[in-house]
């Protein structure tokens, strides 16, 4: 597996091949890699680079991974669950929950695919020890097209993240 990609940083890998294929062994390797980085996540980008018009990624997040609520301007995003359980929480601009999509892999009987076509704040509450998913969005990557929710803590504010996620989990459990 090591010869199939190059590592951009501790969280991002790029495929070296024009045809990207992944198997169970690859996913297990990604799980190991995610467990050794601070934010407990890793992604394999199947697109060639950030300028590609289509971005496809295999992503692994551990349960403790925090995805700050965000939205994408001028982009759509789709997610297909490969392994694990997650609640996708969608918010209005003021941070009120609009919808929760409870997801799992196909065999779970839960929703296993969704697509967002409009800019809406969203985050993940990971319900399993590990979440593996395939995400597709249009490129090229432009950090300015990602808007982080001003009412949600930044990743580095660990205590506020713990409080925010605990409060969010309570709110979701009441829906």
Name each region found by the language model.
Residues 1-53, 99-106, 161-175:
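A short, N-terminal "cap"/entry segment at the start of jelly-roll beta-barrel domains
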Residues 58-75, 118:
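Conserved short histidine dyad/triad with adjacent acidic residue
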Residues 74, 92-115:
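Extended, positively charged loop/linker patches that create polyanion-binding surfaces
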Residues 74-94:
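Glycine- and acidic-residue-biased ligand/ion/polar-headgroup-sensing regions
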Residues 96-100, 106-108, 123-175:
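Double-stranded beta-helix
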